[in-house]
Structures are given as structure tokens and as C-alpha cells.
């Protein structure tokens, strides 16, 4: 009898305590890394050391066929052909990691063919139906646990660096109005809400299938996302609060690409806290919100010598490609760490970069090399490292958010080239949650 009373008491206590929620760690794998060369080439088997830290693995990216609006593989030879069969190679990882949820991610800026089709699809019930039917079939056929909509909406235009006359003309245009980025904003907002609702309806008899939304960077959620209408239909919303400054968007100025809070005298909306706050104040439960850390590092040339690299700085455009990813203006984390000064090198020794951390833990990390006496060789790079990823995870925990996303694993140090530890950025984010 005493045992029964004790059990009843424990049950009552358990009900009184708040439910324990487990933070999500969304790990994106960009399949385009499969065709890179040498140390940058990432195969499905390279994911193994990461998956014990991930709750979700998102395979990117599926794309929209322009003429039919069906969801198809970005690279059928890689994803579906029996030689590689990446789709099945990825979903088969669940056998070793039974708690892992594997989703197929759509768009993600990988779909470069006729990008206007993303808006056109939203305007047509028939197109949405074709997308949904083909998407659900594709996910089921290859064993995915659902779909992530990384929808390619039009982007907010970057700030331009203007001359005096240019600034005057810009002021005149603002006074009399300018052409909006998207002339059918309301229709596309309603269309995306309908897409989410209809896709959720198609999955309603498949209870294990999940549906997520990824907000790509520089997409204006106040325009395209009807938060109250979609938030209860999705398992998470992954907020992409990064890429505010890149060599592509701002080829004459460099700054922190993914600050948590607003640096002084900057756009108050270009930071993680502002992006998250919009969703929370619009009615999203905090546990539905996931914050992204993107591992792309942006390299620019022509750092101003007189300010010792302190951003924002004027630049001459993207820096030269690194030895692994081989993309102008973009570095992976191993390419960054290989350029940094280490204790065995003399301070300031060229061609290495000096790392500058942020003591406030609010803005991010950068590294730089001043120009030489001829004004050449200056470099400035904004990047995510284990410290900044950990700071974002700590922010997520302090706000009781749903988790973090790593975009993407191929740009982490998945070979352990920096210190010998594989996936140091992913690990740091996971440990701080």
C-alpha cells in the first residue's frame, strides 16, 4: 500500500513539473559538395562522425521542374542513379541512428534555373498540386521523413555605397516611390500559406512525416510569411539570420555577416535577434523556432589600413578562392583556420591573418591582413567558428528556442584539418544548447 501511495505521489509530481523538451539540431548536407575535389569533397560516409550530434539531417536540394512544377532531384545521376544512389545512401543512415529524422530540403538557393518559378507556382492551384503530389511521392519512395521548404522568395535589396550625387538621387526616388522587389507580394504570401496548408493536408495520413520551413537569408518574412496561419502546420521554422553582408550582395563594403545583435550604426533588422523577435511577436511558439548558423566564410580584398580591420570597411570585391572549395570570395572553416596566425608564427607574419574576437559575444569574429606598403594584399574575412556557433546556441537556450541549424556540414572541418577534431562548429553548438 505504501508503495502504491509513493507511486501515485511520484506521478502527481511528474505531472506538475514542466515537460522536458529536447533541442533540435538541424544538420544540412549540400549534395553539391559531393562533386568538389580533394579535401572539400564530402561523401555520405563522411557524415558519420556528425550524426550523433544531429536530431535532423536535411539533404539539399530538390528543385522544381519549370514546365511541370514537379519536385525533382537537382542531380539525378548523383541522387537516384544506382551508381551513387545518394537519396537511399542518406536515408539508410537511419538504420545506424534510429532517432535521426531525415528530410528532403527544397530550393535553398541551389535551384538556379528560372528562379521566378517559385513565385509562379504559388499563383496556381494546379501548380501547387503538381508540386505536392510529386514531392510526397519522392520523399516516400526514397525513405525521407518529410520535406523542408527552403523557398526561394525574392530578396531584400542590399545597401548600396553611393557617391554624393547618388545619395541625392536615391533620396529623390524614395520621396516619389520606387518599384517593389515583388509586385505581387500579397498574392505570393497567400499562395505560400496555401502551399503549406495543402502540403500539410497531404501529409495528414502520414503521421511520421514532418514539414519544416526554412527562411532563407534576406527574405522579408513580414511580406511572405503569415505566421499565425502557418505556424501550427509546421514542425519548425528555421530562421536564416546570416549573409547580411557578402561579396555578392555588397562588393564595395564588408561587415559582420551574421551578428546576433545590431552593431552600432547599422540596420537594426539585420541580425539574428531581430529576425527571431519578429516570429515570436507574431505568435510563433518559441519551441518552433530554430536559428541557423551558416558556415560560409566571406573573404574580401582591400582592407583599410588606417582602421586595422574594424568593420565596416571599404573593399575592392571578393578575395581569391581557397585551396579546397575553390570559390572566389568564399572559404570553408578549414580554409580560414589555415590562414590564421598560430603561436608558432611571429605576430603579424604574412601571409597569415590576425583573428579578432568579439568580447561582447554579440557580433561575431573576423580576421584580417593589412595591405602592404603598395596598398596590395589586404584581406578581410567574416566567419563562423566554434566560439560564435556556441554563442548562438547560448542565445537559443536563453530564449527557449527550439534549436539550432548548421548550414551546411560540408563547410565545417569535417576532416579534422584544423585541430584534429572533426565537426568542431557543430560540436560547439550542440554542447551549448
Curated annotation (Swiss-Prot):
One record GO biological process:
carbohydrate metabolic process
Glycosylated position list: 220
Q: Which cysteines are joined by disulfide bonds?
A: 27-54, 337-418
Please verify whether the record's keywords include Zinc. no
Protein localization? Secreted
Say where the protein is mainly found. Answer: secreted
Q: Where is the GH18 domain?
A: 23-433
Q: Per its UniProt record, what InterPro entries does this chain match?
A: Chitinase_II/V-like_cat, Chitinase_insertion_sf, Glyco_hydro18_cat, Glycoside_hydrolase_SF, Glycosyl_Hydrlase_18, IDGF
Does the record carry Secreted as a key word? yes
GO molecular function annotations of the record: chitin binding; chitinase activity
Q: Which UniProt keywords are present, listed alphabetically?
A: Disulfide bond, Glycoprotein, Secreted, Signal
What induces or represses its expression, per the UniProt entry? Answer: Induced 2 to 4 hours after treatment with 20-hydroxyecdysone (20E). Repressed by 8 hours after treatment with 20E, except in the presence of cycloheximide.
Which top-rank group of organisms is this from? Eukaryota
User: What SUPFAM superfamilies does the database record attribute to this sequence?
Assistant: (Trans)glycosidases, Chitinase insertion domain
Annotated signal peptide: 1-16
Q: Name one GO cellular component term.
A: extracellular region
The record's annotation in PANTHER family points to: CHITINASE, CHITINASE-LIKE PROTEIN IDGF1-RELATED
* Family affiliation: Belongs to the glycosyl hydrolase 18 family. IDGF subfamily.
The record makes one more remark, namely:
Lacks the typical Glu active site in position 152 that is replaced by a Gln residue, preventing the hydrolase activity. Its precise function remains unclear.
The molecule here is called: Chitinase-like protein EN03
What's the gene?
Answer: EN03
Amino acid at each position: 500500500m505504501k508503495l502504491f501511495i509513493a507511486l501515485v505521489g511520484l506521478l502527481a509530481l511528474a505531472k506538475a513539473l514542466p515537460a522536458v523538451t529536447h533541442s533540435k539540431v538541424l544538420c544540412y548536407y549540400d549534395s553539391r559538395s559531393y562533386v568538389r575535389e580533394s579535401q572539400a569533397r564530402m561523401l555520405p560516409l563522411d557524415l558519420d562522425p556528425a550524426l550523433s550530434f544531429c536530431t535532423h539531417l536535411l539533404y539539399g536540394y530538390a528543385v522544381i521542374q519549370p514546365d511541370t512544377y514537379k519536385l525533382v532531384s537537382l542531380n539525378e545521376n548523383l541522387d537516384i542513379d544506382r551508381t551513387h544512389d545518394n537519396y537511399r545512401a542518406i536515408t539508410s543512415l537511419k538504420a545506424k541512428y534510429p532517432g535521426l529524422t531525415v528530410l528532403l530540403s527544397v530550393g535553398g538557393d541551389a535551384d538556379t534555373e528560372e528562379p521566378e518559378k517559385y513565385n509562379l507556382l504559388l499563383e496556381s492551384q494546379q501548380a501547387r498540386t503538381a508540386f505536392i503530389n510529386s514531392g510526397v511521392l519522392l520523399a516516400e519512395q526514397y525513405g525521407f521523413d518529410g520535406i523542408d521548404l527552403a523557398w526561394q522568395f525574392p530578396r531584400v535589396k542590399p545597401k548600396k555605397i553611393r557617391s554624393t550625387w547618388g545619395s541625392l538621387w536615391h533620396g529623390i526616388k524614395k520621396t516619389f516611390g520606387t518599384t517593389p522587389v515583388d509586385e505581387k507580394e500579397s498574392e505570393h504570401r497567400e499562395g505560400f500559406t496555401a502551399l503549406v496548408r495543402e502540403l500539410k493536408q497531404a501529409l495528414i495520413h502520414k503521421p511520421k512525416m514532418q514539414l519544416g520551413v526554412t527562411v532563407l537569408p534576406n527574405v522579408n518574412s513580414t511580406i511572405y510569411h503569415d505566421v499565425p496561419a502557418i505556424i501550427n502546420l509546421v514542425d519548425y521554422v528555421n530562421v536564416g539570420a546570416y549573409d547580411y553582408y557578402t561579396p555578392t550582395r555588397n562588393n564595395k563594403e564588408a561587415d559582420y555577416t551574421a551578428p546576433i545583435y545590431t552593431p552600432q550604426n547599422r540596420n537594426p533588422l539585420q541580425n539574428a535577434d531581430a529576425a527571431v523577435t519578429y516570429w515570436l511577436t507574431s505568435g510563433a511558439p518559441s519551441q518552433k523556432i530554430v536559428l541557423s548558423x551558416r558556415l560560409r566564410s566571406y573573404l574580401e580584398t582591400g582592407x583599410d589600413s588606417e582602421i586595422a580591420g574594424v568593420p565596416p570597411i571599404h573593399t575592392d570585391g571578393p578575395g581569391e578562392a581557397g585551396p579546397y572549395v575553390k570559390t572566389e570570395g568564399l572559404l570553408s572553416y578549414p580554409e580560414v583556420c589555415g590562414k590564421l596566425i598560430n603561436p608558432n608564427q611571429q605576430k603579424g607574419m604574412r601571409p597569415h591573418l590576425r583573428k579578432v574576437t568579439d568580447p561582447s559575444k554579440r557580433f561575431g569574429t573576423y580576421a584580417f591582413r593589412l595591405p602592404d606598403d603598395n596598398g596590395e594584399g589586404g584581406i578581410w574575412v567574416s566567419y563562423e567558428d566554434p566560439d560564435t556557433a556556441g554563442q548562438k546556441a547560448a542565445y537559443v537556450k536563453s530564449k527557449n528556442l527550439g534549436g539550432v541549424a548548421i548550414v551546411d556540414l560540408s563547410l565545417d572541418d569535417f576532416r579534422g584539418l584544423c585541430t584534429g577534431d572533426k565537426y568542431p562548429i557543430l560540436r560547439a553548438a550542440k554542447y551549448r544548447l
